Amino acid sequence: DTIGFVFQNFQLMPRESALDNVCLPLIYAGVSKKDRRQMGMEALERVGLSDRADFKPTQLSGGQKQRVAIARAMVNHPKLLLADEPTGALDSKSGKQVLELFESLNESGVTVVVITHDRKVAEQAKRIVHIIDGEITEEGQEAGNEKEKEN
C-alpha cells in the first residue's frame, strides 16, 4: 500500500515536464520506463492535463501545477492521500476543481485527508477534526454542521 502527498506549494521539479514530475514516484517504486509513461499519462488524464504532459511548471497556471501535484500523488494508486493546504495558493475556480477531484478520489476508495485553515474547504469534508497546538479539540463533526454550531 502507498501514500500520496500533495504539498502546499506544489514541489514540482522546474526543469522537468509535467509527465516527468508525475512519474517520479514510479521511478522510486521500480516501475519500468514504458509502464511509468503509461501510468503517468493516465494520472494526468484523470486530472484533465494530458494535453499539458510536455509542459514545464513555468508554463502552467497555479491550478494546473496543483493538479500535476495531485496526479503525482495518486499515480501509485494510494489508499491514503494527504493534502497540505491544497487550495491555499489557488483562485476559487481552481480550488473548487481540486476539491471535486478529491471527492472523486474518495468515491473511488481513496481516503483523503486535507489539512486546511479554510473553513469553506473544511466544510466540504465528510469528517472534520479540529487541532489546536497539536491537540485534538473537536472530532467527528459531519460536514455541513459548521453553520449549526455557529448559531
Task: Pin down the residues of each PLM region.
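ABC family nucleotide-binding domain
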Residues: 1-131
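H-loop (His-switch) and adjacent beta-strand-loop-beta switch element
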Residues: 128-141
